[in-house]
Amino acid sequence: ELRLGDGLSVLSAGEVGTIVLAGVSAQTTWEIIEQAPWVMQPGGPRLVLVPATRHSELRRWLWAHGFALAADRPVQAAGRWYAVMAAEYTGERKEASFTECLFGRTDEWPEGAGYAAWQKAKLPRFRLGVPDGTALAEEIDALLESSPSQAASRPALSKGEPLA
């Protein structure tokens, strides 16, 4: 069945088990989700998300709105890195650090080191817009001084285990 509509407006709760949103910005992705409140319910559909831009901002939004990342895999295509995220609504909100949002769970995959290096290479330019003496500036400076593998490292998790 083919339906024409805006975002998820043509669907209702219980009609689908998985929703794929790919190739749009992080902001467009979360706006589509926000317009379908039935997605943000326990037992709701699994989301497979591939934001074209601002992966870290989408991770922050997901965690802040009660989603857990069941998977977060980096994929390189045409010289550009993408993050393929599988998210499920749990209702447990998480305030994540800049580092967690920047790298997500990508260190669980062989491609994680390349993704971390790509993310880290963008930090000097981003740092220019962050005021000195702030916690964010200190976190970015520490990342810039670390190796890519150290930057993305965190306590090991089993695949599919949400960040606590």
Spans of features found by a protein language model:
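Class I S-adenosyl-L-methionine
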Residues: 8-10, 15-21, 27-164
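Conserved SAM-binding strand-loop segment of SAM-dependent methyltransferases
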Residues: 1-7
